From Swiss-Prot:
The gene is Has2. Gene3D superfamilies: Spore Coat Polysaccharide Biosynthesis Protein SpsA, Chain A. This is Hyaluronan synthase 2. GO terms for biological process: atrioventricular canal development; bone morphogenesis; cellular response to fluid shear stress; cellular response to interleukin-1; cellular response to platelet-derived growth factor stimulus; cellular response to tumor necrosis factor; endocardial cushion to mesenchymal transition; estrous cycle. Phosphorylation at Thr-328 is essential for hyaluronan synthase activity.
Amino acid sequence: MHCERFLCVLRIIGTTLFGVSLLLGITAAYIVGYQFIQTDNYYFSFGLYGAFLASHLIIQSLFAFLEHRKMKKSLETPIKLNKTVALCIAAYQEDPDYLRKCLQSVKRLTYPGIKVVMVIDGNSDDDLYMMDIFSEVMGRDKSATYIWKNNFHEKGPGETEESHKESSQHVTQLVLSNKSICIMQKWGGKREVMYTAFRALGRSVDYVQVCDSDTMLDPASSVEMVKVLEEDPMVGGVGGDVQILNKYDSWISFLSSVRYWMAFNIERACQSYFGCVQCISGPLGMYRNSLLHEFVEDWYNQEFMGNQCSFGDDRHLTNRVLSLGYATKYTARSKCLTETPIEYLRWLNQQTRWSKSYFREWLYNAMWFHKHHLWMTYEAVITGFFPFFLIATVIQLFYRGKIWNILLFLLTVQLVGLIKSSFASCLRGNIVMVFMSLYSVLYMSSLLPAKMFAIATINKAGWGTSGRKTIVVNFIGLIPVSVWFTILLGGVIFTIYKESKKPFSESKQTVLIVGTLIYACYWVMLLTLYVVLINKCGRRKKGQQYDMVLDV
């Protein structure tokens, strides 16, 4: 016992020293700015900090590739499908078409005897259409429905403590005695909805799968996740490959689709190699129910800065599994399609909410670094502090008073994006990943200031994203973007003012003209490809029936 505590203390000290040393090392490399390669007049340079970031991308891609090889080998591993599984669907003001597609995909799941529990966040007349769709798709004679005036934590109007207890027991009994059931309950947020499903199921099943109401599941998605949990008893949770259902509806959804692929099949695949996936996404995830009930109350009652948390449910659920020392995995063999915002403002609000939960959960996650591979510490430091280094770099380049610095920065952003997207295209076997380089512009212009705004408002709670039937009227997310653009515009004006004081040399003019032409041609080429792709694939998608997940 004493030996285990001593080893635990050593691991805590070791991971802490490693993380601090890594951060100090990166900071020192950034400040010193040592250059390996440097041309005359400083038109191009490649330094220690750049070499470190390049090495990170190469190493991350390598481990992702190795994890994908392991996934392919697991196909040959036979398993017995004798474990009980329950699918929990969280619904809130869902688009009827998306909800219908979600439930139709649920009916096509190949895992035998899977139980379906859909909980609707809201019990007003405006929410009844979701229950009607559930009964229509799942079969009125094969499913049950129940309108609950309250939920597990709040009593209904005029309800006593005793009657609230009885209604809670009734809901639990309905869930346990029906293979398919839909419950409408008093509004309380997504975490309240998920809690109802977890609490009502109790320990009656072996594995619990989570799903959002805008998600279409691949028929084999449940089977593939069960395989991962069955192969290793120390794996506590597993997530699948989330693809975009409405990728051709707008430019924002299209860029999100290529970003999703990169996030899951490179970043999370790499994390999975070391058994420390940071977030099992809500649209497609599965947990050991025995673990779930060790922390479900703590998960629901999570507080941050004195306020109860109402967003970041999936990320905190994953962190709770990691806190127990269990591994979390990713499998590309389990797939789904999900809706993503097609409007810029809704997307910005979504990204701000996700960034809030990321930074909050980063602090919580840090307490468990010592229980997992050093890669978990390493990646947390790199991804957690990268935005700050990037902002410092951008401001520094824009206010140095040299037009070439700004142009070089724009070219470098696209070059790095192109290198990453080229590797992703090879791994995926699809040229569409080349558009990932366009997402880098969206990251620099919008996501970067959204991250800073998320930190500044991290204790502000709420559902985070309005229902799909609601028009977005919250424009506050545009404030940080406007401030960021003002800062960049100030840098451009300052640079033009400084450069106008002295004439350009002939060599400088040549470099600027060539750089501008390369940048302009790059954009013309990609935008042309985008228009061609949208016209070709957009028409094909209109008549397509989503009987299975297609990687297009």
